[in-house]
Amino acid sequence: ITQAKVRVRRLPEAESFFGVFFPSWEQGSEAVREIVQNELPVSMLRLSNPLETETTLILSGKSWVRLADRGLRMIGYGDTRCLMIFGITGSTRLFKRTQREAAALCRKYGGLFVGTVVGHTWEKSRFLAPYLRNTLWDSGIALDTLEAALPWAQVRAASGAIPQAIVEAMSKHNEQVLAFAHLSHVYRDGASIYTTYLFRRTAEPDELLRRWHEMKHQASLTLQKYGGTISHQHGVGTDHALYLPAEKGALGMDALHAVCKSFDPDGMMNPGKLF
């Protein structure tokens, strides 16, 4: 590749990221659903479950977190609280209107609007988290993520069941797993659930791989149970190909085979990643 075309757009007149705490995951997810179904033009929207919320606050390393934690608990935002971060990008007029309408919807579901401090912290550190993987590995901790998408009717139950399946997969080994999730990409008809899990490395690489497969398999079976797609944006690949037929059915798989055969009759374009 020697040339590329890129899209450009004007810098926005205004852009900020805001934080909102909800008393529970149920209230937060309903607020997210209503924001997107009302087509508010937010540029970013994310809801962390209670465990991810606490992990995010702890890892922020900010001195104000302890004071904020105490204050939140005093007014009813305790162990089940969830953090939403949303962004608004555009003209000043659009910015003000969207902020006003989003804040009103959040308050409808018990949301506590906390301004831009939390959102700004996320904005500054959002690309740093992936670099923790190597440091954690050197410290004896493995980290992985998995993502999927489901209709709204299944989001609430599946968002708890998927991390729980990962935890239970390791319980027979008397191993603890830190598994949490957030809603990332959201749509009028559903949302992507993004799960992160951390677990202790074993001395033997083969045993570590086997345990990882156990967790991945149980999470994938749970996802299938709730009718989700095996991947939202990471792709199917060799890790997920086993679960694709159950999602697409015989006719769907035949269609995929036909498309690949038509565009790649010699099987040269990354073969073996779907079937």
Predicted regions and their residues:
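C-terminal substrate-recognition/cap domain of FAD-linked oxidoreductases
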Residues: 8-10, 21-22, 29-218, 226
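General beta-strand structural signal in soluble alpha/beta enzymes
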Residues: 2, 43-47, 115-116, 232, ...
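FAD-binding core of FAD-dependent oxidoreductases
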Residues: 1-12, 230-236
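Shared catalytic-loop signature of beta/alpha-barrel
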Residues: 203, 208-210, 215, 222, ...
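Activity-critical C-terminal alpha-helical subdomain
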Residues: 236-275
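Small/polar glycine-rich anion-binding or flexible loop at a beta-alpha turn
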Residues: 49-51, 186, 229-242
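Short, conserved aromatic-histidine micro-motifs
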Residues: 13-31, 215-220, 253-267
